[in-house]
From Swiss-Prot:
Main location: endoplasmic reticulum
Primary gene name: RTNLB13
Topology term for the membrane: Multi-pass membrane protein
Signal peptide coordinates: none
Transmembrane segments: 27-47, 50-70, 134-154
Tree of life domain: Eukaryota
Record localization: Endoplasmic reticulum membrane
Pfam families: Reticulon
GO cellular component: cytoplasmic side of endoplasmic reticulum membrane; endoplasmic reticulum membrane; endoplasmic reticulum tubular network
Swiss-Prot/TrEMBL keywords: Endoplasmic reticulum, Membrane, Transmembrane, Transmembrane helix
Protein name: Reticulon-like protein B13
Residue intervals of the Reticulon domain: 16-206
Length: 206
């Protein structure tokens, strides 16, 4: 009697997550090595992002042209391009994902601007300001390289030391809130004193 029970295939782990968390050390190290070498070469020769993209486009179009020409010369058959069509489901899913991302960004901006506390707002503005300064000092491929290096280091550090980081951040948040409350109370006291002093001067003048 044949066994009808089939085992479910084991789910495949996410390759990107494995690289960021260094579960596949060889692949993560290879990614870091290739990106570092590419960044050094680009910085050494002074290439810009537009130049690199243009050269990649030239190479891709040239290879496709040679491939199509060889197919026509050898087999006299036109290249099969039906597999290059973009399905409607893919387009709909891509549009839905982009819309959800934009809606989430808009909601996040309104939460930070209208609903969050002052230190969240200040931290967000400071982050955007630092990002703008980095953008003025660095070119595009350097920013991409820094982002990749941070992506390969920050998640791993957060996985190992996330609890300690959250503990210190919570302590810093409480201290900042206490300092803000103290400063706010002192400012209110000074305003009240100035207001009472002004009223007394007005009464004396009358």
């Amino acid at each position: 009697m044949a066994n009808d029970v089939t085992k479910d295939p084991t789910p495949k782990s996410d390759i990107v997550e494995d690289i960021y968390l260094w579960r596949r050390k060889k692949l993560a190290f290879s990614t870091l090595l290739v990106s570092t070498s590419t960044w050094i070469l680009l910085s050494f020769y002074g290439f810009t992002t537009i130049t690199i993209v243009s050269w990649i486009g030239i190479a891709v179009v040239s290879m496709i042209f040679l491939w199509g020409s060889l197919l026509r010369l050898l087999s006299k058959v036109e290249p099969e391009l039906s597999g290059l069509e973009v399905s409607e489901e893919f387009v709909v899913e891509t549009v839905r994902s982009c819309r959800m991302l934009m809606e989430e960004m808009v909601r996040w901006m309104f939460r930070v601007g209208a609903e969050s506390e002052w230190f969240v707002f200040a931290r967000t503005v400071l982050g955007f300001w630092i990002l703008s300064r980095i953008g003025n000092l660095l070119d595009f491929h350097t920013c991409l390289f820094i982002g990749l290096v941070m992506g390969l280091t920050v998640p791993k550090l957060w996985e190992e030391y996330g609890d300690q980081i959250q503990k210190h951040l919570g302590s810093l948040k409480d201290k900042s809130k206490g300092a803000y409350n103290t400063t706010h109370e002192k400012i209110l006291e000074m305003k009240n004193k100035l207001h009472h002093g002004t009223e007394e001067k007005v009464k004396k003048s009358e």
